[in-house]
């Protein structure tokens, strides 16, 4: 069984820029919201090779990413040199001092079982400053793959041993962000074309602010 680091290292080694170079639809939505709320600095946990960070850094934001794969970090430094990228796990974000106005996280939270999801969000809380905004996307229960594999926790399935995917209902997502004040939630249809197959993910997003 691969560790998380080994899994992502192999994937980025084998497939390079897996999801192409264009940012996700949700990153564009987050960009509009961050501008509206006066955000200046953004943390991107699970930043990959920089396809989403580059949208923010090229739009004038001060951007920091954290990514577990060495290969992805190296790709990001070439693809998006304006973003600072730290190599490490999102479950331990003690990579440097300072806090951020906002966090943007694309399709990372659902890759963990419940205890680690809670830990991840606590790590995020510790990295948010006074503005304290967060925009997360996750797999929804409307995903075509929902229910496939071995159920290891409620609404969490392993497509292969050690690779959990949690599928969020809206109620579940809001509950995970109970230490935040929810501003907006919704569904976003995110098209992807990798592995030779075009498909669309049905994601939930939440835009929230750290509770005072």
Residues covered by each model-derived region:
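Class I (Rossmann-like) S-adenosyl-L-methionine-dependent methyltransferase catalytic domain
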Residues: 1-43, 48-95, 112, 116-119, ...
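Short catalytic micro-motifs in class I SAM-dependent methyltransferases
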Residues: 107-111
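A conserved beta-strand element that flanks and buttresses the S-adenosyl-L-methionine
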Residues: 104
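A short glycine-rich, Lys/Arg-flanked "PGG" loop and its adjoining helix->strand segment in the class I
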Residues: 118-130
């Amino acid at each position: 069984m691969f560790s998380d680091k080994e899994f992502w290292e192999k994937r980025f080694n084998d497939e390079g820029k897996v999801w192409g170079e264009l940012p996700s639809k949700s990153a564009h939505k987050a960009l509009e919201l961050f501008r509206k709320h006066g955000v200046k600095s953004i943390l991107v946990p699970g930043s990959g090779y920089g396809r989403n960070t580059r949208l923010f850094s090229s739009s004038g934001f001060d951007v920091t990413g954290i990514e577990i794969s060495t290969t992805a970090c190296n790709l990001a430094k070439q693809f998006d040199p304006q973003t600072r990228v730290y190599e490490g796990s999102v479950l331990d974000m003690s990579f440097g001092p300072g806090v951020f106005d906002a966090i943007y996280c694309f399709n990372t939270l659902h890759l963990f079982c419940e205890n680690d999801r809670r830990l991840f969000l606590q790590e995020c809380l510790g990295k948010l400053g006074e503005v304290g905004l967060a925009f997360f996307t996750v797999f929804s229960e409307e995903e075509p793959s929902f229910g496939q594999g071995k159920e290891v926790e409620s609404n969490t399935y392993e497509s292969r041993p050690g690779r959990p995917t949690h599928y969020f209902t809206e109620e579940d997502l809001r509950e995970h962000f109970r230490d935040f004040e929810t501003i907006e939630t919704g569904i976003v249809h995110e098209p992807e074309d990798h592995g030779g197959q075009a498909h669309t993910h049905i994601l939930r997003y939440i835009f929230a602010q750290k509770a005072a």
